[in-house]
């Protein structure tokens, strides 16, 4: 009878203890799982967006950038996520049709609305920077330039973004922002590139690259000189990026973009003719007519005073001659290298410190070299470019059309000039030598991001955009660790008690009565 009572007591106690231990075990496991899942839950991506429109002399492009709301040393880690080219000319081409600007920008702005989450439209800044085409128009007709910018501002303001204004950026800004872009994409500014998922550089002291930009109406050169100079303070700019200060030399040559340089050359070539230009920079058997007004009314061609006998002419006829050497010599005449009021100059009396370091050449520098099939190698020699141009310029127009029929006639007809112009600009204008030419790297995209001034502009502006606190887990790390240890110990204690209890001898249960 007594054995039966002991057995019943043991069963009764076992059930109660089992219930308590089981309940405690479940609570501890649930607590551990809840803590782990909550604390380690993937945090929502906390990013910001920005839009920059590059209103160039020949076209307009829209770029969308994004960066983490929490910034690195006060500068955002920015990456390009979208590029949209606007159909049509640059905005300076709307001087006689300002009312069409609204339609002109519609497609790209609607695209931006789709790419950026609607919840962030109101906080996304939009900037439009107009470059050399509008700088020229402002010099020729300031009232018209202001009217175009007002129309652009009115059009962009209709969209649900934070429009920050449309303005004409200076040549210095264009050059400096291009320099920022090149060095940012090459990892020269910061070691912490984890947001980009890139391998950080081990060399924190590596030198920055210089930047060479060639557009339709201007060209820019920007680099950090080996020795800081005060000869021409107007050419010095200072930046603070990623917690470090930079002093750069920069200069923009208005009228020396490839399109305006060609007009200068044609105006110069018109001298001493009867209105027919035999142009060595165009292929033989090629013919083109241009309006006389383009040459005698343009800001860039005014310095080449045309004889009054040309004024009655409505059209100028251009006949290609296809001679690289003559083309090269005629382009050299555009650069005045005989006058220099400083210790060293580029051309037209503009100060240029000795060239230093590697250079990234982009925009038209790259596009022309790509057409000539000279961008596949790490570096291209002067001899390679010269040989290619001699061969290409000597081809008859029909042959060129046959070989490159998919290229628009305007661009195709000018590649001989553009390639030769690049050669002369770099050698005679910026004074690269056959040896230092090897330091020039022609680039278009780096890590899927376009090389140009817009990214540098966005990076510089993020210095002015307040940073946000990083997204953090619900619990402080110390609290999380304490609770995990506590519930783990509780679970361990429950298991140990369970093992001890169920292995006690029978007299243990008697003692409990």
Swiss-Prot record:
Name this polypeptide is given: Ectonucleoside triphosphate diphosphohydrolase 1
Subunit structure and binding partners: Homodimer; disulfide-linked.
Topological domains, Extracellular: 38-481
Source superkingdom: Eukaryota
Primary location: membrane
Role description: Catalyzes the hydrolysis of both di- and triphosphate nucleotides (NDPs and NTPs) and hydrolyze NTPs to nucleotide monophosphates (NMPs) in two distinct successive phosphate-releasing steps, with NDPs as intermediates and participates in the regulation of extracellular levels of nucleotides. By hydrolyzing proinflammatory ATP and platelet-activating ADP to AMP, it blocks platelet aggregation and supports blood flow.
Annotated keywords: ATP-binding, Calcium, Disulfide bond, Glycoprotein, Hydrolase, Magnesium, Membrane, Nucleotide-binding, Transmembrane, Transmembrane helix
Record topological domains on the Cytoplasmic side: 1-16, 503-513
PTM: N-glycosylated.
InterPro entries noted in UniProt: GDA1_CD39_NTPase
